[in-house]
UniProtKB/Swiss-Prot annotation:
Cofactor or coenzyme needed: a metal cation; thiamine diphosphate
Catalytic activity: a 2-oxocarboxylate + H(+) = an aldehyde + CO2
Listed name of the protein: Probable pyruvate decarboxylase Pdc101
Origin species: Schizosaccharomyces pombe (strain 972 / ATCC 24843)
Complex formation: Homotetramer.
Domain of life: Eukaryota
InterPro entries reported in the protein's UniProt record: DHS-like_NAD/FAD-binding_dom, PDC/IPDC-like, THDP-binding, Thiamin_PyroP_enz_cen_dom, Thiamin_PyroP_enz_TPP-bd_dom, TPP-bd_CS, TPP_enzyme_TPP-bd, TPP_PDC_IPDC
Positions of post-translational Phosphothreonine modification: 521
Length: 569
């Protein structure tokens, strides 16, 4: 081997090596002529396997599901017709704080200034529109125009994804993947974490501890950014140090153990997990947030918006305390050091324990009675153990899922900031690819499923035993509760038959119908025996059968949506 050969590799191989080095074993793809050469380099790189997807939206959602389990993911699509579709799912990854590396092929560099019109474009000579969009939806976007620039640009994008917990975009022209570039340096330069500024960390924890010492009823609140910050264990340490009541936001379910002695429920305003949870939270004199995020959904149409004068919050890289903001203070380090500086503040935990809500176990329905939502959830609850990951689709599945009891080790996945119906099925596929040893269960409605259900095809292809409970109530239930109209009624499908229709000649998917509790029990037994592919159980329930929480929440959100314009807006 010559000296030059030892110091160079191709751009495609460079990207493949970096993906493997950061822990990616599978990349999700939809092929197109602008990315085919790149896909060859990725496919044949040791330790990296391709997962084909049915379309680019599903590809992006599958990658974000993989990132939920693996910590980071990669999706590869073609230019314009592929990437513009994928951007929807990448927007979700941005909103949900998930590092997904979106790689798009692009036209041959010789055509960019040639005056040629190219396919898969707008039919103009503007080839920058995709990059302009990508910059709005990612924390870093790079286009490799020269092979010698590839290492720095690829490393920069990957590092930003890791540091900012957001998606990034890498554009590689079709004639660039096979071009030589320098070999990579140590991966530590890309993945090494940043640490807090020591002086800022000390000052922030001192002021926070002093503020807490002056309060009688502080509480802790875990938010949706807690997991991405890697601060779950630090949150537990602070809960134990303060010995106060510790709550979670709905999008943080599963990030803090429901079996922990300080756990006090899901706070969600008037649709909180219990009246006791709501009362204790709202009587507190200081909310200590860890990665909290307040929007119109999480505040029930702004009715549960926090009082900023009593909110202390730690974000990824900053801490805000009434009257102060500290930059370069990382969440996990802040919570851990703060735990060493505070004393016990048990008033809120004592108040919660005095009126602790009793666990109500629903009675089994009559075996031959018409199936209803409560019976479906009762039987799903019986499947949830420490090895379960439960997906709750946007809609009433949110509220059904939040009522589930999670034992230690169980995980829960929602998409509450982006709120894209249809997200759960492709995301669960990606999750199951990353964590095949776990039991992945999906709760999804009929309307949501119709957007992305064909991704069951990849569950069949890769023999992923995902268990899908499809609640068929013949419409967009969440939209009905927010604002009803004929547009919320959909064409009914035979969803169980649809699932099996994707088997082809060799697939092992099972599609089953359940119209009674007895039939659901039998269907679950069949599902648990099917280890070679997914099982979809179509649960027929009444159109109006939904949680009261969805009804109440829907009215509040509808009211917020209907506010008339004001003079200042």
């Amino acid at each position: 081997m010559t000296k030059d050969a030892e110091s160079t590799m191709t751009v495609g191989t460079y990207l493949a090596q970096r993906l493997v080095e950061i822990g990616i074993k599978n990349h999700f793809v939809v092929p197109g002529d602008y990315n085919l050469r790149l896909l060859d380099f990725l496919e044949y790189y040791p330790g990296l396997s391709e997962i084909g997807c049915c379309n680019e939206l599903n590809c992006a959602f599958a990658a974000e599901g993989y990132a939920r389990s693996n910590g980071i993911a990669c999706a590869v699509v073609t230019y314009s017709v592929g990437a513009l579709t994928a951007f929807d799912g990448i927007g979700g990854a941005y909103a949900e704080n998930l590092p997904v590396i979106l790689v798009s092929g692009s036209p041959n560099t010789n055509d960019l200034s040639s005056g040629h019109l190219l396919h898969h474009t707008l039919g103009t000579h503007d080839f920058e529109y995709q990059m302009e969009i990508a910059k709005k939806l990612t924390c870093a976007a790079v286009a490799i125009k020269r092979a010698e620039d590839a290492p720095v640009m690829i490393d920069h994008a990957i590092r930003q994804a890791i540091l900012q917990h957001k998606p990034v975009y890498i554009e590689i022209p079709t004639n660039m993947a096979n071009q030589p570039c320098p070999v990579p340096g140590p991966i530590s330069a890309v993945i090494s974490p940043e640490i807090s500024d020591k002086e800022s960390l000390e000052k922030a924890t001192d002021i926070a501890a002093e503020l807490i010492s002056k309060k009688e009823k502080p509480i802790l609140l875990a938010g949706p950014k807690l997991r991405a910050a890697g601060a779950e264990s630090a949150f537990v340490k602070l809960a134990e140090a303060l010995n106060c009541a510790a709550f979670i936001m709905p999008a943080a379910k599963g990030f803090y153990s429901e079996e922990h002695k300080n756990y006090a429920g899901v706070y969600w305003g008037e649709v909180s997990s219990s009246e006791t949870t709501k009362a204790v939270y709202e009587s507190s004199d200081l909310v200590i947030g860890a990665g909290v995020l307040f929007n119109d959904y999480s505040t029930v149409g702004w009715r549960a918006a926090p009082n900023p004068n009593i909110l202390l919050n730690s974000d990824y890289t900053s801490v805000s305390i009434p009257g102060y903001v500290f930059s370069r203070v990382y969440m996990a380090e802040f919570l851990e050091l703060l735990a060493k500086k505070v004393s016990k503040k048990p008033a809120t935990l004592e108040a919660y324990n005095k009126a602790r809500p009793q666990t109500v176990v629903p009675k089994a329905a009559e075996p031959k009675a018409a199936l209803n939502r409560v019976e479906v959830m009762r039987q799903i609850q019986g499947l949830v153990d420490s090895n379960t990951t439960l997906y709750a689709e946007t809609g009433d599945s949110w509220f059904n899922g939040l009522q589930m009891k999670l034992p230690a080790g169980a995980k829960f996945e929602v998409e509450m900031q982006w709120g894209h119906i249809g997200w759960s099925v492709p995301s669960a596929m990606g999750y199951a690819v990353a964590a095949p040893e776990r039991r992945t269960i999906v709760m999804v409605g009929d309307g949501s499923f119709q957007l992305t259900g064909q991704e069951i095809s990849q569950m069949i292809r890769h023999k992923l035993p995902v268990l899908i409970f499809l609640l068929n109530n013949r419409g967009y239930t969440i939209e009905i509760q927010i604002h009803d109209g004929p547009y919320n009624r959909i064409q009914n499908w035979d969803f169980a038959a649809f699932c099996e229709s994707l088997n082809g000649e060799t697939g092992k998917a099972k599609g089953l119908h359940a119209k009674t509790g007895e039939e659901l029990t039998s269907a679950i037994k069949v599902a648990l025996q099917n280890k070679e592919g997914p099982t979809l159980i179509e649960c027929a329930i009444d159109t109006d059968d939904c949680t009261q929480e969805l009804v109440d929440w829907g009215k509040a959100v509808a009211s917020a949506n209907a506010r008339p314009p004001t003079a200042d807006n």
